[in-house]
């Protein structure tokens, strides 16, 4: 009888202890969740409302329905729908082209990373040193990288012009502005991919290479039929992360190609990305049309949600392709 009472008391104490630990765990888990709601969830709701309403950033109680003026301003050219002192639609479509162009270069960085990782996987002399050297650009500050490339590409005393013996204005010529941003990205981005691919190579079963060699496969066949399928999950992850980073390019573009006088995104806006356009609209949120109404915040919300949806859809497509390749 006493043994049963003691057992019941022990179980009750364990339940009480578990309940206390459970409550403590929930409290700890809710701390980052609360931060997410405040700093991500709330702005997300405000931006969604801002697509359809005029929102005053300094007074969120002042919200008025805008009859889809934000959508009209973004997608309809100036000659058809004139709201601002500049053609927002023209800037938007140019920013779309440049952003897609920059995002597509992630494929190049992926190929560069794969090529270098393949060479390093053969373990040449100094492989560890080269791996560190290739990774350094990735961990460098974006500000430092941007200043370095501005110094290299400067038309007056820049290293590139000194080597070529020319005086080309790389950072001011509309034909070369976007290429300056792309070159900087290709220089900085592959380091992370190299490390990831090196780890992926190590996880491939060596027995597969031995079996392929027994079957008479040459180096190319082993690479295509063994290595590529083995690193497919890593490739899809890097592609997904790279495309998202490309679509959200801002700091590198803004620092290498600052806004020109009377133009956003450098000369002829050839350094303008969608995120830079959003930043410009928010910074000029007090600018009004001929009726004294500002649609800048609404337009910024429209572009932000467009980027969000495009990035989400592309990520879902790549995720499904990754699952299919794993089957």
Give the label of every model feature segment.
Residues 1-19:
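Short, Lys/Arg-rich, polar N-terminal cytosolic tail immediately upstream
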Residues 16-327:
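A structural signal for multi-pass alpha-helical bundles of membrane permease subunits
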